[in-house]
Amino acid sequence: MLEVNVGTMIIATGFQTFDARRTPYYGYGKYENVYTALEVERLVNASGPTNGEVVTRDGKHPKSVGIIHCVGSRDEKTHKWCSRVCCMYSLKLAHLIKEHTGAEVYNFYIDMRTPGKGYEEFYD
């Protein structure tokens, strides 16, 4: 057995991204400017395809953005359970979009779940 003294340990169990085309009623793959969270994450990233500049696929800066929570979770047709990460991840993206564009950001959710110390304040 190997013993290692470390300050932090990260256990990454892995995950599989949800295919947003499984929820066609949101328009992913049908409407040009409907994105997955991972695609938005790449847009706001300085090393992303637009060097951190948040633009739509037609190259325009959005004036308003809608973020739909729980896509693929809490849904009888996909997964019935709450992932416990989507709300905070969506709120993080909302802050980043607002910071990068000044656009008005609207969050659409069943109910906001922020289970953690200081998380509810992040929502405000």
Predicted regions and their residues:
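Residues forming the flavin
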Residues: 1-124
